[in-house]
Amino acid sequence: MIYNFPRKKRKQITNYLTFSSPNPFSIRVETPGWDGKLYYSTDTKRWVEWTGNEVNATEADGIYALYFSGTGNTKIAGGSSYKWTLNGSSISCTGNIESLLDYETVAAGHHPTLADSCYSSMFSGCTSLTTVPSLPATTLTDSCYSYMFSGCRSLTTVPSLPATTLARSCYSSMFSNCTSLTTAPSLPATTLTYSCYSSMFSDCRSLTTVPSLPATTLTDYCYNYMFRGCTNIKLAISKSREYDKEYRIPKSGNGVTATRALDNMFMQTGGTFTGTPSINTTYYTSNTIV
Protein backbone atom coordinates (compact mmCIF):
# COMPACT_ATOMS: atom_id res chain seq x y z
CA MET A 1 0.00 0.00 0.00
CA ILE A 2 1.32 3.45 -0.94
CA TYR A 3 1.00 6.35 1.46
CA ASN A 4 1.09 9.90 0.09
CA PHE A 5 0.56 11.63 3.40
CA PRO A 6 -1.11 15.05 3.45
CA ARG A 7 1.20 17.94 4.19
CA LYS A 8 0.58 17.96 7.93
CA LYS A 9 1.15 14.20 8.28
CA ARG A 10 4.13 14.21 5.93
CA LYS A 11 5.78 16.91 7.99
CA GLN A 12 5.68 14.63 11.03
CA ILE A 13 7.81 11.95 9.36
CA THR A 14 11.06 13.69 10.03
CA ASN A 15 12.14 10.79 12.22
CA TYR A 16 13.45 7.84 10.24
CA LEU A 17 16.50 5.69 9.68
CA THR A 18 18.63 6.51 6.67
CA PHE A 19 20.62 3.82 4.89
CA SER A 20 23.06 5.25 2.36
CA SER A 21 26.00 4.17 0.24
CA PRO A 22 28.02 5.39 -2.73
CA ASN A 23 27.14 2.05 -4.32
CA PRO A 24 23.83 0.34 -5.22
CA PHE A 25 22.34 -1.76 -2.41
CA SER A 26 19.14 -3.44 -1.30
CA ILE A 27 17.51 -4.45 1.99
CA ARG A 28 15.17 -7.33 2.76
CA VAL A 29 13.86 -9.32 5.72
CA GLU A 30 13.00 -12.96 5.10
CA THR A 31 10.71 -13.19 8.13
CA PRO A 32 9.48 -9.83 9.48
CA GLY A 33 9.70 -9.56 13.25
CA TRP A 34 7.93 -6.26 13.87
CA ASP A 35 4.52 -6.15 15.54
CA GLY A 36 3.19 -2.87 14.15
CA LYS A 37 3.87 -1.25 10.79
CA LEU A 38 7.06 -0.28 8.98
CA TYR A 39 7.30 2.03 5.99
CA TYR A 40 10.08 2.69 3.52
CA SER A 41 10.78 5.56 1.16
CA THR A 42 13.34 6.49 -1.47
CA ASP A 43 12.83 10.25 -1.07
CA THR A 44 11.29 10.80 2.45
CA LYS A 45 8.07 12.04 0.80
CA ARG A 46 6.35 9.00 -0.64
CA TRP A 47 6.08 6.18 1.91
CA VAL A 48 5.18 2.56 1.24
CA GLU A 49 4.17 0.02 3.87
CA TRP A 50 6.90 -2.60 4.00
CA THR A 51 6.40 -6.34 4.36
CA GLY A 52 10.09 -7.25 4.28
CA ASN A 53 10.30 -7.68 0.51
CA GLU A 54 13.59 -6.70 -1.12
CA VAL A 55 13.74 -2.96 -1.79
CA ASN A 56 16.43 -1.22 -3.82
CA ALA A 57 18.07 2.06 -2.95
CA THR A 58 17.57 5.00 -5.31
CA GLU A 59 20.46 7.20 -6.44
CA ALA A 60 20.49 10.99 -6.08
CA ASP A 61 23.59 13.16 -6.47
CA GLY A 62 25.83 10.11 -6.45
CA ILE A 63 24.43 8.62 -3.22
CA TYR A 64 22.08 5.66 -3.02
CA ALA A 65 19.59 5.81 -0.13
CA LEU A 66 16.63 4.14 1.55
CA TYR A 67 14.60 5.46 4.48
CA PHE A 68 12.59 3.51 7.06
CA SER A 69 10.10 4.57 9.73
CA GLY A 70 7.48 2.83 11.82
CA THR A 71 4.34 3.10 13.94
CA GLY A 72 2.91 0.95 16.71
CA ASN A 73 5.91 -1.35 17.10
CA THR A 74 7.41 -2.66 20.33
CA LYS A 75 9.94 -4.87 18.54
CA ILE A 76 11.68 -4.89 15.17
CA ALA A 77 13.56 -8.19 15.10
CA GLY A 78 13.60 -10.77 17.87
CA GLY A 79 16.36 -13.22 17.01
CA SER A 80 18.34 -14.60 14.09
CA SER A 81 15.21 -15.72 12.20
CA TYR A 82 14.16 -12.08 11.86
CA LYS A 83 17.43 -10.40 10.94
CA TRP A 84 17.74 -7.82 8.18
CA THR A 85 19.81 -8.61 5.09
CA LEU A 86 21.79 -5.78 3.51
CA ASN A 87 23.13 -6.56 0.04
CA GLY A 88 25.79 -4.12 -1.13
CA SER A 89 28.91 -2.48 0.22
CA SER A 90 29.87 0.47 2.44
CA ILE A 91 26.35 0.95 3.79
CA SER A 92 25.86 3.58 6.48
CA CYS A 93 22.86 3.62 8.81
CA THR A 94 22.11 6.89 10.59
CA GLY A 95 19.27 8.30 12.67
CA ASN A 96 17.46 7.20 15.80
CA ILE A 97 16.73 3.46 15.90
CA GLU A 98 13.57 4.21 17.91
CA SER A 99 12.05 5.81 14.79
CA LEU A 100 11.35 2.26 13.63
CA LEU A 101 9.22 1.62 16.70
CA ASP A 102 7.06 4.73 16.58
CA TYR A 103 8.18 7.91 14.85
CA GLU A 104 5.43 10.01 16.46
CA THR A 105 6.58 9.09 19.96
CA VAL A 106 10.15 10.02 19.00
CA ALA A 107 8.94 13.30 17.47
CA ALA A 108 7.24 14.10 20.79
CA GLY A 109 10.54 13.65 22.61
CA HIS A 110 9.74 10.34 24.29
CA HIS A 111 11.07 6.79 24.14
CA PRO A 112 8.77 4.14 22.61
CA THR A 113 8.15 0.95 24.57
CA LEU A 114 10.66 -1.87 23.94
CA ALA A 115 9.60 -5.50 24.04
CA ASP A 116 12.01 -8.26 25.06
CA SER A 117 14.49 -9.09 22.26
CA CYS A 118 13.37 -5.94 20.45
CA TYR A 119 16.44 -5.59 18.19
CA SER A 120 18.07 -8.95 18.86
CA SER A 121 20.23 -10.08 15.89
CA MET A 122 18.76 -7.32 13.71
CA PHE A 123 21.98 -6.65 11.79
CA SER A 124 23.81 -9.86 12.66
CA GLY A 125 26.28 -10.76 9.93
CA CYS A 126 25.82 -7.51 7.97
CA THR A 127 29.43 -7.23 6.87
CA SER A 128 28.68 -4.24 4.62
CA LEU A 129 27.39 -2.06 7.48
CA THR A 130 29.89 0.71 8.28
CA THR A 131 27.90 3.03 10.57
CA VAL A 132 25.14 2.22 13.03
CA PRO A 133 22.24 4.37 14.28
CA SER A 134 21.91 6.01 17.67
CA LEU A 135 20.56 3.83 20.48
CA PRO A 136 19.12 6.36 22.93
CA ALA A 137 16.99 4.11 25.16
CA THR A 138 17.76 4.57 28.85
CA THR A 139 15.65 1.66 30.14
CA LEU A 140 16.31 -1.69 28.49
CA THR A 141 14.49 -5.01 28.25
CA ASP A 142 15.63 -8.64 28.27
CA SER A 143 17.97 -9.40 25.33
CA CYS A 144 16.92 -6.19 23.58
CA TYR A 145 20.32 -5.61 21.93
CA SER A 146 21.73 -9.15 22.10
CA TYR A 147 23.70 -10.08 18.96
CA MET A 148 22.36 -6.92 17.31
CA PHE A 149 25.60 -6.18 15.43
CA SER A 150 27.37 -9.51 15.84
CA GLY A 151 29.65 -10.18 12.88
CA CYS A 152 29.40 -6.64 11.47
CA ARG A 153 33.04 -6.73 10.44
CA SER A 154 33.15 -3.28 8.80
CA LEU A 155 32.16 -1.35 11.94
CA THR A 156 34.98 0.72 13.45
CA THR A 157 33.03 2.77 15.99
CA VAL A 158 29.72 2.39 17.77
CA PRO A 159 27.20 4.84 19.27
CA SER A 160 27.00 5.82 22.91
CA LEU A 161 24.99 3.54 25.18
CA PRO A 162 23.32 5.80 27.74
CA ALA A 163 21.12 3.17 29.40
CA THR A 164 21.32 3.05 33.17
CA THR A 165 18.49 0.57 33.75
CA LEU A 166 19.64 -2.74 32.32
CA ALA A 167 17.85 -6.06 31.83
CA ARG A 168 18.75 -9.72 31.54
CA SER A 169 21.27 -10.33 28.69
CA CYS A 170 20.52 -6.89 27.27
CA TYR A 171 23.98 -6.38 25.69
CA SER A 172 24.99 -10.03 25.42
CA SER A 173 27.23 -10.58 22.34
CA MET A 174 26.04 -7.26 20.94
CA PHE A 175 29.31 -6.52 19.11
CA SER A 176 30.86 -9.98 19.10
CA ASN A 177 33.12 -10.66 16.12
CA CYS A 178 33.12 -7.03 15.00
CA THR A 179 36.72 -7.44 13.93
CA SER A 180 37.29 -3.84 12.77
CA LEU A 181 35.85 -2.20 15.89
CA THR A 182 38.49 -0.03 17.56
CA THR A 183 36.59 1.97 20.16
CA ALA A 184 34.23 0.77 22.87
CA PRO A 185 31.47 2.99 24.26
CA SER A 186 31.33 4.02 27.89
CA LEU A 187 29.06 1.88 30.06
CA PRO A 188 27.55 4.10 32.77
CA ALA A 189 25.17 1.65 34.46
CA THR A 190 25.81 1.12 38.16
CA THR A 191 23.19 -1.61 38.65
CA LEU A 192 23.81 -4.79 36.68
CA THR A 193 21.62 -7.71 35.63
CA TYR A 194 22.12 -11.38 34.78
CA SER A 195 24.54 -11.80 31.84
CA CYS A 196 24.10 -8.15 30.86
CA TYR A 197 27.57 -7.70 29.26
CA SER A 198 28.41 -11.34 28.60
CA SER A 199 30.58 -11.72 25.44
CA MET A 200 29.67 -8.16 24.47
CA PHE A 201 32.99 -7.55 22.67
CA SER A 202 34.25 -11.09 22.21
CA ASP A 203 36.59 -11.50 19.22
CA CYS A 204 36.77 -7.76 18.55
CA ARG A 205 40.43 -8.10 17.60
CA SER A 206 40.96 -4.42 16.71
CA LEU A 207 39.53 -3.05 19.96
CA THR A 208 42.02 -0.74 21.70
CA THR A 209 39.83 0.95 24.33
CA VAL A 210 38.18 -0.53 27.41
CA PRO A 211 35.24 0.91 29.32
CA SER A 212 35.52 1.65 33.01
CA LEU A 213 33.05 -0.40 35.01
CA PRO A 214 31.48 1.53 37.91
CA ALA A 215 29.03 -1.06 39.27
CA THR A 216 29.96 -2.30 42.75
CA THR A 217 27.48 -5.18 43.02
CA LEU A 218 28.01 -7.75 40.29
CA THR A 219 25.43 -10.25 39.08
CA ASP A 220 25.65 -13.80 37.77
CA TYR A 221 27.60 -13.95 34.48
CA CYS A 222 27.52 -10.16 34.08
CA TYR A 223 31.04 -9.76 32.62
CA ASN A 224 31.93 -13.31 31.63
CA TYR A 225 33.81 -13.60 28.30
CA MET A 226 33.25 -9.87 27.80
CA PHE A 227 36.60 -9.29 26.02
CA ARG A 228 37.47 -12.85 25.03
CA GLY A 229 39.66 -12.89 21.92
CA CYS A 230 40.26 -9.12 21.94
CA THR A 231 43.96 -9.47 21.19
CA ASN A 232 44.65 -5.72 21.35
CA ILE A 233 43.29 -5.45 24.88
CA LYS A 234 46.28 -5.74 27.20
CA LEU A 235 46.33 -6.14 30.97
CA ALA A 236 49.14 -6.85 33.41
CA ILE A 237 49.42 -7.50 37.12
CA SER A 238 52.26 -5.01 37.60
CA LYS A 239 52.71 -1.45 36.42
CA SER A 240 55.33 -0.78 33.75
CA ARG A 241 56.17 1.72 31.06
CA GLU A 242 53.77 -0.05 28.70
CA TYR A 243 51.10 -0.95 31.24
CA ASP A 244 50.77 2.44 32.87
CA LYS A 245 47.04 2.92 33.55
CA GLU A 246 45.20 1.47 36.52
CA TYR A 247 42.23 -0.75 35.68
CA ARG A 248 40.01 -2.08 38.42
CA ILE A 249 36.65 -3.83 38.83
CA PRO A 250 34.79 -1.95 40.12
CA LYS A 251 36.35 1.34 39.11
CA SER A 252 36.23 2.48 42.74
CA GLY A 253 34.84 1.29 46.04
CA ASN A 254 34.50 -2.27 47.30
CA GLY A 255 32.68 -4.61 44.97
CA VAL A 256 30.68 -7.74 45.66
CA THR A 257 30.96 -10.53 43.10
CA ALA A 258 28.47 -13.20 41.98
CA THR A 259 28.40 -16.60 40.28
CA ARG A 260 30.85 -16.65 37.36
CA ALA A 261 30.51 -12.88 37.07
CA LEU A 262 34.11 -12.45 35.86
CA ASP A 263 34.79 -15.85 34.30
CA ASN A 264 37.22 -15.62 31.38
CA MET A 265 36.52 -11.91 31.01
CA PHE A 266 39.98 -11.38 29.46
CA MET A 267 40.48 -14.83 27.95
CA GLN A 268 42.78 -14.83 24.89
CA THR A 269 43.54 -11.12 25.17
CA GLY A 270 46.97 -9.71 24.36
CA GLY A 271 48.49 -8.75 27.70
CA THR A 272 50.61 -10.57 30.22
CA PHE A 273 47.49 -11.17 32.32
CA THR A 274 44.64 -13.11 30.71
CA GLY A 275 41.65 -15.05 31.91
CA THR A 276 39.53 -14.34 34.96
CA PRO A 277 40.29 -11.16 36.95
CA SER A 278 39.67 -10.77 40.66
CA ILE A 279 37.24 -8.23 42.00
CA ASN A 280 38.66 -5.29 44.01
CA THR A 281 42.09 -5.85 42.45
CA THR A 282 44.08 -3.24 40.56
CA TYR A 283 45.49 -4.30 37.20
CA TYR A 284 47.34 -2.18 34.67
CA THR A 285 46.56 -1.64 31.02
CA SER A 286 48.20 -0.09 27.99
CA ASN A 287 44.81 0.71 26.51
CA THR A 288 42.76 3.88 26.63
CA ILE A 289 40.01 3.71 29.26
CA VAL A 290 36.67 5.31 28.41
Range-by-range predicted roles:
Residues 25, 34-38:
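Short beta-strand/loop motifs in extracellular/secreted proteins, especially
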Residues 31, 117, 257-264, 268:
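A composition-driven surface/loop motif
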Residues 52-57, 77-115, 124-142, 152-168, ...:
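Structural signature of tandem-repeat unit edges
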